UniProtKB/Swiss-Prot annotation:
This is Small ribosomal subunit protein uS15. The gene is rpsO. PANTHER family: RIBOSOMAL PROTEIN S15, BACTERIAL AND ORGANELLAR, SMALL RIBOSOMAL SUBUNIT PROTEIN US15M. Belongs to the universal ribosomal protein uS15 family. Pfam families: Ribosomal_S15. GO terms for biological process: translation. Part of the 30S ribosomal subunit. Forms a bridge to the 50S subunit in the 70S ribosome, contacting the 23S rRNA.
Amino acid sequence: MALTVEQKAQIVKDFQRKEGDTGSSEVQVALLTFRINDLTPHFKANPKDHHSRRGLLKMVSQRRRLLAYLRRTQPDTYRALITRLGLRK
């Protein structure tokens, strides 16, 4: 199921740096993480859905690039974000 407008607004509100911030790396990573987590049950039920799997892999790659950028430019923000999202065990 796709993110609803309300869910997306709540995620943006939770991760924004300041009021009106919708495009910062933290917000983008959070949105991608929730979309990725939302697709996981779909692939358990539909293991042969390769077309959607390609979209999932694109999202994972985009999130990886954004996290690498954050790690390189703002290490403290990166550590706080991965802890908050439960990434990197």
